[in-house]
Amino acid sequence: MLCRSDKAMRQVPHKTASIELPNDKFLKEVRTLIAAGHDVTLRVRGVSMRPFLEDRRDQIVLTQPGVVKVGDAVLAEIAPGKYVYHRIISIEGDKVTLRGDGNVYGTEQCRLEDVAAATKELIRKGRSYSAQGKAWRYYSALWPSWSFARRVLLKLYRMLKLYK
């Protein structure tokens, strides 16, 4: 994962070194930086946000969560020291339900206070998208919440990836 505060990111040229640390320790520090008012850039790890964010290729810029809503992709602590970057699919009172774009059925839950960061920007295939911009909102709205369609589209996506 790549982590730099917003100020450091602007000063660093395109080529940056990256280091890998255990998520429980690393993301605790990320959460501290965000709570202090910094934006943090992370390289995506894992496939749970496919097809929109790819493992080790894409990056996310995280910021303080503010008011989150259904459809937002957030970094949340779902158990002590266990963090996920997934999309909010429902909010009922203080209970937030999350699901990765690449997950067909599985969901996670946390409390509103456990949402550590919101997405400010996404860097996909080297191109920057605002999380509040039309392109990302369009992607988010098009991605079906219906399990069967999600399963079929993810299967097609995986098959196409094999033939590249």
Task: Show where each model-derived region lies.
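Extended hydrophobic leader/signal-anchor segments used for secretion and membrane insertion
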Residues: M1-K164
